[in-house]
């Protein structure tokens, strides 16, 4: 929609392939005609979904009775509004209040862990908690059946499974909250003695971050940013292991100066929001080391190889 040049997404997806990005998608530019009428230049890509050839995590099994009507429940911590900085842009957080809301029990495990709100598909059932996740960091989280908001206001929705159970949402939310607690710690360790890198594959997230920096993509960790997780569970349904993987790269419409929104503007007005994770990541030497190694290695090679590719593709776009 914002890709006025017609090359933004092509360049980003191709570079992501070049640097060995996690779950990098196939992409093919096409001229689209519908009933003989030219409709413009489109990119045909893989869909972001759980599959061995897409995002390779285990698909969950459900025992939901056929024909059960869909419904959503939203759970919100008491005094929800007081948890946010008064100078922050809260319009997206306020969306959590819309819809069916349940006053959480005092012993709700997710809220006790620091999660501020979450939603789940009430009709779904599992005999036993199982399966992996494709999560999207996105301020448009309320479009999905399952989502949660972390202690620092990061909004995360479930892309797969599309309709998660309460147990699935709680398990994933608690695990991500443990990661965030470690990320915000000066030492990088949370109260459980686990380092943030125990939860996060640093290299994979460094790839999506550096790609966003290079292309001027200001939606990083704000919208359309994917994380996937292949977890291990204990007998109580808690996630005990597995690393959040950055990727696949997606939605680079607003890159290469396609918009005048800048990181500095976003950060100054959204201090507790999604992009607050960026400043915390950059405080940790292992993340900046990963960026430097990538910048001087695989990324430098990708930039060099892309020069001819983009020029050639640009000529093709001009011809279209």
Task: List the predicted regions and their residue ranges.
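Internal "kinase-insert"/substrate-recognition segments embedded within catalytic cores
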Residues: 1, 18-25, 37-210, 314
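Solvent-exposed loop/turn segments at secondary-structure junctions
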Residues: 2-5, 37-39, 47-51, 140-142, ...
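TRNA-binding/sensing appendages of the translation machinery
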Residues: 4-16
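Alpha-helical scaffold elements adjacent to nucleotide-binding pockets in ATP/GTP-utilizing enzyme cores
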Residues: 11-12, 44-48, 290
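Active-site catalytic microenvironments for nucleophilic, acid-base chemistry
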Residues: 15-19, 229
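Short, acidic/polar N-cap/turn motifs at the starts of alpha helices
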Residues: 27-29
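Middle-to-C-terminal accessory/interaction subdomains
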Residues: 158-222, 228-320
């Amino acid at each position: 929609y914002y890709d006025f040049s017609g090359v933004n997404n092509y360049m980003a997806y191709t570079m992501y392939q070049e640097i060995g990005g996690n779950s990098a998608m196939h992409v093919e530019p096409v001229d689209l005609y519908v009933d003989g009428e030219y409709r413009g230049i489109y990119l045909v890509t893989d869909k972001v979904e759980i599959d061995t050839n897409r995002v390779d995590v285990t698909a969950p099994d459900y025992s939901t009775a056929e024909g059960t009507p869909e419904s959503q429940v939203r759970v919100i911590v008491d005094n929800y509004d007081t948890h946010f900085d008064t100078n922050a842009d809260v319009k997206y957080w306020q969306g959590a209040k819309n819809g069916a809301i349940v006053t959480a029990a005092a012993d709700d495990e997710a809220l006790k862990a620091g999660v501020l709100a979450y939603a789940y598909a009430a009709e779904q059932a599992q005999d036993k908690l199982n399966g992996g996740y494709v999560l999207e960091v996105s301020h448009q989280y309320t479009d999905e059946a399952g989502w949660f908001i972390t202690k620092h206001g990061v909004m995360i929705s479930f892309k797969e499974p599309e309709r998660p159970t309460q147990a699935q949402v709680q398990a994933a939310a608690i695990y991500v909250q443990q990661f965030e607690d470690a990320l915000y710690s000066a030492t990088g360790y949370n109260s459980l003695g686990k380092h943030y890198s125990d939860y996060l594959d640093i290299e994979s997230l460094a790839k999506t971050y550096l790609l966003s920096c290079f292309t001027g993509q200001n939606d990083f960790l704000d919208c359309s940013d994917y994380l996937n997780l292949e977890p291990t569970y204990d007998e109580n349904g808690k996630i005990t292991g597995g690393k959040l993987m950055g990727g696949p790269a997606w939605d680079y419409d607003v890159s290469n100066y396609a918009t005048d929104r800048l990181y500095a503007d976003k950060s100054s007005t959204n201090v507790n929001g999604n992009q607050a994770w960026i400043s915390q990541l950059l405080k940790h030497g292992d993340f900046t080391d990963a960026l430097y190694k990538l910048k001087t290695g695989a990324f430098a090679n990708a930039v060099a190889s892309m020069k001819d590719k983009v020029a050639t593709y640009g000529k093709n776009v001009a011809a279209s």
